[in-house]
Amino acid sequence: MILYEYPFNERIRTLLRLEDLFERLDFFLTQEHPLQHHVALTTLFEIVDVAGRADLKSDLLKELDRQRQTLTVLRSNPQIDQEALDAVIAELETASGNLTATHGKAGQLIADNEWLTSIRSRAIIPGGTCEFDLPAYFAWQHHPGERRRADIVKWAQPLVPLRDATMIVLRLLRESGQSGKVIANAGSYQQMLSGRIYQLMQVRLDDVALGFIPEISANKYMLWVRFTQQDGDLRPKPVDADIPFQLKLCNF
């Protein structure tokens, strides 16, 4: 089974990008080869670039607080598992408190580190991090894997509150929708939204339909999913078959 997600606004698009980058950082950070730690470090630079949006922190804090207030009202509902509810509220409060405690721009520690800044500026140049360009970085890559990993973890540590806030907001958003089975007749599916506002759409394909690729577009009035399939040169071509899939529309 494969899951495709489509954000309806720039804020959710930014959070999805951060989630993807944090997951990539986690993966390469657990590896041992210097080249894998190079990817981890350049991924950290990408996280700083994406997280540099001025209003991202305030947006996350507002969303965490809104979710906390919404869930707090449910404490008087006897049909709600109060223990699970309290755990989520506590998680929101912790994430909000930790994010509030951060100071300066995201990645300020990296920006203030002249050595990291030199690597960051060279990393955007194709082949720009060779040993003759950055001999000190080349030497660092020959340190033991545990030492390199500890360094990257230290540099990434100030971004942990941002990561935690991003993950809980996306998790609650994904849990807010209900999935339904639909069919793309002749490879195409349309649905009127009647002005209802959504923030995220999920298209889930089972194993039989893994070869089909959804092209998704949406606005506040309707959504459109058109399936394509790659030919021998991997170029997309339209699909005329009826394709069943699961559709989920999410909104807080």
Curated annotation (Swiss-Prot):
Subunit structure: Interacts with FtsZ.
InterPro entries linked: ZapD, ZapD_C, ZapD_sf
Protein name (record): Cell division protein ZapD
Free-text function comment from the UniProt entry: Cell division factor that enhances FtsZ-ring assembly. Directly interacts with FtsZ and promotes bundling of FtsZ protofilaments, with a reduction in FtsZ GTPase activity.
Family: Belongs to the ZapD family.
GO cellular-component term (any): cell division site
Organism: Ralstonia nicotianae (strain ATCC BAA-1114 / GMI1000) (Ralstonia solanacearum)
Alphabetical UniProt keywords: Cell cycle, Cell division, Cytoplasm, Septation
Pfam families: ZapD
GO aspect biological process, one term: division septum assembly
Cellular localisation: Cytoplasm
Main location per the UniProt record: cytoplasm
